Amino acid sequence: MFEDEPHAEGAAAVAAAREALQALCQELNLDEGSAAEALDDFTAIRGNYSLEGEVIHWLACSLYVACRKSIIPTVGKGVMEGNCVSLTRILRSAKLSLIQFFSKMKKWMDMSNLPQEFRERIERLERNFEVSTVIFKKFEPIFLDIFQNPYEELPKLPRSRKQRRIPCSVKDLFNFCWTLFVYTKGNFRMIGDDLVNSYHLLLCCLDLIFANAIMCPNRRDLLNPSFKGLPSDFHAVNFKAAEEPPCIIAVLCDLHDGLLVEAKGIKEHYFKPYISKLFDKKILKGECLLDLSSFTDNSKAVNKEYEEYVLTVGDFDERIFLGADAEEEIGTPRKFAADTQFGKLTSQASVDCNLQQHFEKKRSFAPSTPLTGRRYLQEKEAVTTPVASATQSVSRLQSIVAGLKSAPSEQLLTIFESCMRNPMGNIVKIVKGIGETFCQHYTQSTDKQPGSHIDFAVNRLKLAEILYYKILETIMVQETRRLHGMDMSVLLEQDIFHRSLLACCLEIVLFAYSSPRTFPWIIDVLGLQPFYFYKVIEVVIRSEEGLSRDMVKHLNSIEEQILESLAWTNNSALWEALRASANKVPSCEEVIFPNNFEIGNGGSVQGHLPMMPMSPIIHPRVKEVRTDSGSLRKDMQPLSPISVHERYSSPAAGSAKRRLFGDDPPKETLMEKIMAEGTQLKIAPSSVTAESLSISPGQALLTMATTTVTGTTGRKVTVPLHGIANDAGEITLVPISMNTTQDSTAESLVSLTAQSLIGASPKQTHLTKTQDAPLTGISKPKRTGSLALFYRKVYHLASVRLRDLCLKLDVSNELRRKIWTCFEFTLVHCPDLMKDRHLDQLLLCAFYIMAKVTKEERTFQEIMKSYRNQPQANSHVYRSVLLKSIPGEVVAYNGDYEMTDGDIEDATKTPNCSSEPVKEERGDLIKFYNAIYVGRVKSFALKYDLSNQDHIMDAPPLSPFPHIKQQPGSPRRISQQHSIYVSPHKNASGLTPRSALLYKFNGSPSKKAKKRVIAISGDAESPAKRLCQENDDVLLKRLQDVVSERANH
């Protein structure tokens, strides 16, 4: 990708770029300073990158950046940013569509290493474009519903200036209504990129134009006679409009997915006062906006005001939707059916497809389905527009809290009063403090986004408070039943629990309204640590069944964001929790439930499959049963085996929790002592057998699986063992039987470290205390508590993503387990590698290095291609990785394990054209891998190099790989409209022994009975059905196809 071109060719290219830039600047009337800066940046970038596509498009990106940095003094001794050149003009001159601009601009920002403030500006601009595109798609059909089709009327005849004015056409009305909307929306910047509020503002504009059309006696021809909002006597010959302008807000909300209360609030408190202000400023005039004498002046005045707004405040001229070349310039939807010729359909379909792909890639209005947490998803709703989806989310939220108040219910008050110390006062104080902080930041303008009106803030806060008390009551009822009436004071007195729960409710409300204040805005303004906030997410999802499918996906994606990066920042509370636990990072085996690992060395066939799509919805009764530990079936893994109490327990899972709840003995168990101190294990002589054992009261019996020991002769010995542990912490392993290829005499006792037998390999020995085995078949992990829960979720998230990558790249189970072992090694022994970095960065590096070591190589380009298809993938993850300070000496790494630029198609170099000094050194993933990662992991990874005999003996056992979490609930409801449930197939036991013959009286003729007897008694298999050949690869491929097909729907 980074090719050195001849000097002459490079000079010619720069000259051509300079000529193209000069022509562009002349057309835009730009100053020389901005042009020179744009050319310098372009030349620096081109020296480091191969820029694909037209040069003029990249010049437009460079020119836009230069213009945004330009400051122009104004008459009022202020300053104005932007050279008075709108983005629309730049793109129109460069013949670059908006969708292409956003795509290229993202790459340009990465290559130029532009500051975060500029990136956020582009993100706001892109979201504003997306909101406007979605609103315009709704505007056209609503306009057609109310008014005549503007493309069915005859074109205007040319006329001289002396001719008198003619009435406005439907097309003029269409353009005026949209321009008035975008100009009004620009005035209310707090509404601009809020989809729900913007849509209701559009309904207000349509309502205003309709009222003027009704009130003007000669303009009723503009209206659609079949519109349902017309007055009942509209078609009467002597129809006379009422004195008060009619309001059709209710009709529009009913017909076009609006929220009546929200829309009327926008009209009364924002739109009507603003229109009055426009009349006072003489921008609008006349008794009727559509009067013959005033419409033209009104249209010109609104367009002039909006042009000034675009040049001074805005970037994106939203009138571009109305242009004749809108489809080419931006990718807007088709105008109207009557205007669309047959020849345009193909190109229009392509434009709509590009627009749809852009929205799907951005995921602004419909969050993608994360790889984890799918068991909580409900069934898919019918396909709706983004506006309908947003308004339905708000309606659903309002239906959840309907009839409730922002205060504790009688039942919740009873729970508070039953506590040893009534927490009511403290809870009210916390809620009030969070409410004040939220309103202050929600209404405050910042560089990132404008402030909203206090009415919006109060409305959002009230919804969140009602939801908070509702969910808190549900949690308390579940916990009381789960813990059999235990006192709730400890949980209810934890401020972090209430702050996290209310913050989560606020996030739900903001997401329902499609607010631009996206996560982690809410925890930033409330000062919440992500490491604490994530604990409440699953609790909320399980406690509130009314959440929509998109809402659950959004909350799941937030949890993934925290687990993958936000909890690993330099100032995260995670590092304090690790210090409190003596910096002992738990391994996967210590935190995952023992029965949640794959079985066998290579893993089961099931273990090679990706996360299976779960049935959409869990039956409420099944979910209710699962939350009650007392009602769990013996063979059922609980949905969340950790209670809310345990989630908010002290990071040290011993003292506090045990004193408060008494569910663990206060004394350190023998097994904990053994694991902590690395007890020496001894194999007793073969003369000692399990049958001759006698166990004293101070000893414990340990049940063992088989272990494989390599003797001095190199022979492998399979030894089934029993173990006895005494008070001194020593374990004596007693062989039950020994199978070898030849007879061998018992030698002196073989010393093995505990790590070798309680390590990570599924072949290894597992030590469990017999008396500690739970009767329900659900055994607890070795480490519990707050920190263990966090790492359990981290390991699960990483395993799901790795499984998905391995499936797409056709990686063997053996290599997958080695990658997993390497990844776990970095988390446990090199936790600092995760500081201010991303989980996927370490996962991708582990994948690459182990593929190199084992000679099952995958190029980084192949790995990245598969990674980009994951729902959470973001180019920032692999293009901007934190780099530590590197010593002056260059470490001579083995070239075989170094990543080269040829391995990745879009590797990035950091050019020296950064607009601001870089606060921290960052680079692409290749640079991080070669400069930092290899040096820390190479010695460990080389132990799995099978081509080197010295390494085979040193290779640690492979870590166990978590298996797919199966849906524990059964039966599962698959539809909310129909009572249809899915249950696992049960092997029905026959009513009679298999040796007997089944004869059905009055149903089995004698001839068929004879044939049945012959078929059963014969040795040959019945040819009634075609035999299925046992081919695991074919079966696996079919299952993979089914899974992929389900995942794409």
Curated annotation (Swiss-Prot):
Region Spacer, annotated ranges: 585-779
Keyword Plastid included in the entry's annotation: no
Subcellular location per the Swiss-Prot or TrEMBL entry: Nucleus
Family annotation (Gene3D superfamilies): 1.10.472.140, Cyclin-like
Region of interest: Domain A: 385-584
Location of region: Pocket: 385-944
Top-level lineage group: Eukaryota
Pfam family, one: DUF3452
Ranges for region Domain B: 780-944
Modification sites for Phosphothreonine: T332, T369, T385, T992
Post-translational events: Cell-cycle arrest properties are inactivated by phosphorylation on Thr-332, Ser-640, Ser-959 and Ser-970 by CDK4.
PANTHER family attached to this UniProt entry: RETINOBLASTOMA-ASSOCIATED PROTEIN RB -RELATED (PTHR13742), RETINOBLASTOMA-LIKE PROTEIN 1 (PTHR13742:SF20)
Function: Key regulator of entry into cell division. Directly involved in heterochromatin formation by maintaining overall chromatin structure and, in particular, that of constitutive heterochromatin by stabilizing histone methylation. Recruits and targets histone methyltransferases KMT5B and KMT5C, leading to epigenetic transcriptional repression. Controls histone H4 'Lys-20' trimethylation. Probably acts as a transcription repressor by recruiting chromatin-modifying enzymes to promoters. Potent inhibitor of E2F-mediated trans-activation. May act as a tumor suppressor.
Subunit and partners: Component of the DREAM complex (also named LINC complex) at least composed of E2F4, E2F5, LIN9, LIN37, LIN52, LIN54, MYBL1, MYBL2, RBL1, RBL2, RBBP4, TFDP1 and TFDP2. The complex exists in quiescent cells where it represses cell cycle-dependent genes. It dissociates in S phase when LIN9, LIN37, LIN52 and LIN54 form a subcomplex that binds to MYBL2. Interacts with AATF. Interacts with KDM5A. Interacts with KMT5B and KMT5C. Interacts with USP4. Interacts with RBBP9.
Name of the protein: Retinoblastoma-like protein 1
